[in-house]
Amino acid sequence: MSGLGENLDPLASDSRKRKLPCDTPGQGLTCSGEKRRREQESKYIEELAELISANLSDIDNFNVKPDKCAILKETVRQIRQIKEQGKTISNDDDVQKADVSSTGQGVIDKDSLGPLLLQALDGFLFVVNRDGNIVFVSENVTQYLQYKQEDLVNTSVYNILHEEDRKDFLKNLPKSTVNGVSWTNETQRQKSHTFNCRMLMKTPHDILEDINASPEMRQRYETMQCFALSQPRAMMEEGEDLQSCMICVARRITTGERTFPSNPESFITRHDLSGKVVNIDTNSLRSSMRPGFEDIIRRCIQRFFSLNDGQSWSQKRHYQEAYLNGHAETPVYRFSLADGTIVTAQTKSKLFRNPVTNDRHGFVSTHFLQREQNGYRPNPNPVGQGIRPPMAGCNSSVGGMSMSPNQGLQMPSSRAYGLADPSTTGQMSGARYGGSSNIASLTPGPGMQSPSSYQNNNYGLNMSSPPHGSPGLAPNQQNIMISPRNRGSPKIASHQFSPVAGVHSPMASSGNTGNHSFSSSSLSALQAISEGVGTSLLSTLSSPGPKLDNSPNMNITQPSKVSNQDSKSPLGFYCDQNPVESSMCQSNSRDHLSDKESKESSVEGAENQRGPLESKGHKKLLQLLTCSSDDRGHSSLTNSPLDSSCKESSVSVTSPSGVSSSTSGGVSSTSNMHGSLLQEKHRILHKLLQNGNSPAEVAKITAEATGKDTSSITSCGDGNVVKQEQLSPKKKENNALLRYLLDRDDPSDALSKELQPQVEGVDNKMSQCTSSTIPSSSQEKDPKIKTETSEEGSGDLDNLDAILGDLTSSDFYNNSISSNGSHLGTKQQVFQGTNSLGLKSSQSVQSIRPPYNRAVSLDSPVSVGSSPPVKNISAFPMLPKQPMLGGNPRMMDSQENYGSSMGGPNRNVTVTQTPSSGDWGLPNSKAGRMEPMNSNSMGRPGGDYNTSLPRPALGGSIPTLPLRSNSIPGARPVLQQQQQMLQMRPGEIPMGMGANPYGQAAASNQLGSWPDGMLSMEQVSHGTQNRPLLRNSLDDLVGPPSNLEGQSDERALLDQLHTLLSNTDATGLEEIDRALGIPELVNQGQALEPKQDAFQGQEAAVMMDQKAGLYGQTYPAQGPPMQGGFHLQGQSPSFNSMMNQMNQQGNFPLQGMHPRANIMRPRTNTPKQLRMQLQQRLQGQQFLNQSRQALELKMENPTAGGAAVMRPMMQPQVSSQQGFLNAQMVAQRSRELLSHHFRQQRVAMMMQQQQQQQQQQQQQQQQQQQQQQQQQQQQQTQAFSPPPNVTASPSMDGLLAGPTMPQAPPQQFPYQPNYGMGQQPDPAFGRVSSPPNAMMSSRMGPSQNPMMQHPQAASIYQSSEMKGWPSGNLARNSSFSQQQFAHQGNPAVYSMVHMNGSSGHMGQMNMNPMPMSGMPMGPDQKYC
């Protein structure tokens, strides 16, 4: 019967009673009783079933009415089971109560059990509550810490813990209780956890020892391994007091255990008897294949040489003990890596005796390293971290640290380098840089300096002046170029160069002395640059610890010597001695720098620095830096003992550091020439550093220049060249070189004088690599330089050219135009053919250059920029210009160098490109870049300069002209030549011209000082462009020379022109202009002059002020467009490209350029005239025709896209722009923009119309603008028929207007062309140019058209800048557009045309406007 049935029984029985009444009363009673019993039985069984089913989940049969029997059976089973379990439990209890139970009395007495256990554990027991107080400690603590039990009980555990271990200990303490309930979340932490901590030992005070020891030194810590149990169950049961405690057993860690029980890392250092590092052997670390070994070595050495880290030992005491006992062992110490990893280290040293004489020879120290993977120590090595300041301030500490790598390197090459000197402390710091006593100079230590003079490789260390004291260094650091690494934007460094180049700058001082020190130093410098240590170069130098490594100057100069010894070894000086050691030491001072540097190196494609282990990469970098320095005349640097060993190396090291080295060498060898060269170099370096403002830009440029720069570098040293190339960190090296040069500028004179004899000796050695400009050794090295420079050139062959070439071959001038060396990604290609030129130029220019450099010194910021721009016209125009302009607005403006740098649009490199490599080269040939040409022109107006010109790079170098040879027209033939070509204003237009092609980049650099800078740029640019065009047409700049033959022809023409113009003074140039009919052309562009004047009145000052901060490159962009226009004239395709490039550059720079467009416009007048003249002179009508054709073609192509105007500039610019833009990290942007422009040009009309419609919605004048655009399209087609004129006139107008057009390129970038400009002006820029010119002249055209057109452009490219700029420009545009020659007369109008071109970039009809604007040369009037 089922339970359910039973449940129903009562009901059933009731019904039965009613239905079946008993017949008899007795039966009725019996029947009812049975029923009740059954009902009750059913109820109980039902309840039982419920209990069973509730307790048993396996009774499935109960789901269906189980019968009573089944329920009872299951119940019985369960009851039995329960009883059995009870019996088992009782039996267990009995067992627990047995005699053997742990709860019973044991064989071992409880009192003795604890001590025995502790003895077996070799530790002591202590209990700490959650507040950190010791509530119990075992008596045997005395055996370990010398404290008595009562001394520690109820005291804070933190009193005996090392401050660095307190946080780790705190993590293991139980959490505080909440509402009396402790460890709510700690129940799972019952397992023991192990950690290490240092506990203070109570040591008896030794009176004598205490007197001489600091309180920290009196403290001795014992490293203990603690096994902690936070919440034992037993403790919980006993009470709450212990529940919140942590029970620890601390045991002593044996020395073997301390020093990395398994697979320890280690490296060996060799020290002289004074403890200075002589050599660093990192083979074991390298073999470990662990990442960041350079950083760990650097930091370990820093820590080892730093003040005691609260321990009772110091490096000095350690070696004293080793000296007395023959061996010594340090306690375990810790330091942290850049990534925060804690490293435990221990150093064991043995006294090394001469096996023959048994005399004490030195110490061999083995550093055991163990990385702690568990837990992060926020400041595991505060002392180590503090080492940097101590290293900077503490010679011994720093020396020891930096010295160890250097000495290791130096010692092999020559202990004389200060390794053995008492002043080696400073030297050791220097060693960090170069592996020689160079650091001594760096570190403020008399000993250091004395070794530096003694060593000559200390020249880098001559930075007795605080490395940080020289702001110039930081700006010039390739850090900027590299950077993305760059810790601080190079822009910061830009002003740093402002101090007299090299006066404070360790680079200049270092340039004179430490050459081999450079290798290690160069690595640091490169690292610093990579990290973006804008100003840290000096600080690096001053701080032997972290920053010392970064000192580019040290890296640059010293490595040249070091590399001379071992060109392959970045520690050239150390050669086989473990370049890594020096690099590591350097890294120690700059761990971050090294890391960043490695990153940037990889970014640059120069992982070689860090990738191949800094030993290899650094070697290459050092070699490059050294070689360049040598090329630049730094061979003198090798004058010291290092000199002989480094002669060959120096040659191979020419490239990255070659420029700087040769520059330094030149300074040393020809102190007088170098004095001026150094000043000029210093400024150039500053500008270069400024130019390489952003680490990203630097990184891109470096990446681009990596292969290319190396090519130029290779010319110096074949084997080393390759390495140098691999060291695409050339930028870094360049920065180092720049820094070095900067430091050397002022100190250079003194150092030059001091080192001059040495330099002469070194010169011979260095000249091999760089055909140093030093007269004595320049020719000697010339053949090698020739080897480096694809083109020939005796050392004499234009020291200017040699210097320029040097710069080119150097990082700054990876290519002839590689003044941006690192930036020259594209330029390198363009100038690869002319690399030889770069090297040779460097040499040639070097000798000639020093005097001129002095002159240019005044323009030093420009000089820096200009010289590099000469080299790197195309590749870095944008980048260099930005930094230079932004960093040195005035420099750009006032300084011809800047102009030259600007002027060398293709030389833009001069301004910016050089920063990377040329900058260092420039320092020597600061004017060299700009001046080298000028110097060449002056000294060798025809031959030297021609030599340079044949060298494509030198052509780019012509930006030397932008140096504003105009200040010295006669003295600067090239500049004059270009000025004549730009004759409108030899002084101003050259800058405009030069700036225009790449001036935009330059302008960007000059951002801050756009007004003056623009003129300077334009003026210099003109001269420079001529030359750069010769060296590298826009085509070359855009990519590897697109047409070598065409370039050769252009170069030949430019050479001839250069020779002619170089030999003619301003008057002669004017006569030539008249003969060419340039004055007439200028008269045609009278409107331009008024505009220029007006704009000049406004000058870039307003625009620059508006955009100076925002658009460093933007402003230059506008300036360049004018130059671009001029280039169009001067060099039909090249200049056309240049102009376009300028415009594009301008466009690119135009990101913040539109206001500057206005600024440029004032200058447009002169630049226009100069461009017209230059075009006519250089290219004649052919160039004009070519320019016209190019413009027409480009305009036609863009007609589809709104970048018609932009197109003309853009397409050529695309080529050139790719070069310099790529170099400026805008390479990709420029490419994308170019491709985008091409597409947009095809769709430009569509886009422009759409944009116009959109802008019409936004602006009431859009309808008018559309009409104007239609007219413009018609007129542009007409105007484009005379694109040459347009080109010429736009060249002139474009200098001003062109910059406006470059505004469009900014649009390519995030900013609209209007960005930073009045919206109305923006339209003016957008469309005002060609379409609005006619209409603008008659109407409000400029403003309306620009408004309408630009909106189109803006809509397509939507660059806010454009809008901002046009308002200023619109006023001018409208006022000028009214003039008959809107394009010619109105830079604004032409600017508008360029803006249209810009807009074209932006996708407007600019293409059409561009042609119109281009026409204005001839069709200016028709434009209206």
UniProtKB/Swiss-Prot annotation:
EC number: 2.3.1.48
Region (Disordered): 1-38, 408-493, 501-520, 537-674, 709-730, 755-798, 912-945, 1273-1321
Biased composition (Basic and acidic residues): 589-602, 779-789
Tissue specificity remark: Widely expressed. High expression in heart, skeletal muscle, pancreas and placenta. Low expression in brain, and very low in lung, liver and kidney.
Source species: Homo sapiens
Gene3D superfamilies: 6.10.140.410, Helix-loop-helix DNA-binding domain, PAS domain
Protein name in UniProt: Nuclear receptor coactivator 3
Chain span(s) of sequence motif LXXLL motif 2: 738-742
Catalysis performed (reactions): L-lysyl-[protein] + acetyl-CoA = N(6)-acetyl-L-lysyl-[protein] + CoA + H(+)
Positions of post-translational Phosphoserine modification: S214, S551, S569, S601, S694, S728, S857, S860, S867, S1033, S1330
Record's comment on post-translational modification: Acetylated by CREBBP. Acetylation occurs in the RID domain, and disrupts the interaction with nuclear receptors and regulates its function.
Impact upon substituting K708Q: Does not affect acetylation by CREBBP
Sequence segments annotated as region (Interaction with CREBBP): 1023-1093
PROSITE patterns found in the cross-reference section: BHLH (PS50888), PAS (PS50112)
Note: NCOA3 is frequently amplified or overexpressed in breast and ovarian cancers.
Keywords associated with the record: Acetylation, Activator, Acyltransferase, Cytoplasm, Methylation, Nucleus, Phosphoprotein, Repeat, Transcription, Transcription regulation, Transferase
Gene name, Swiss-Prot/TrEMBL: NCOA3
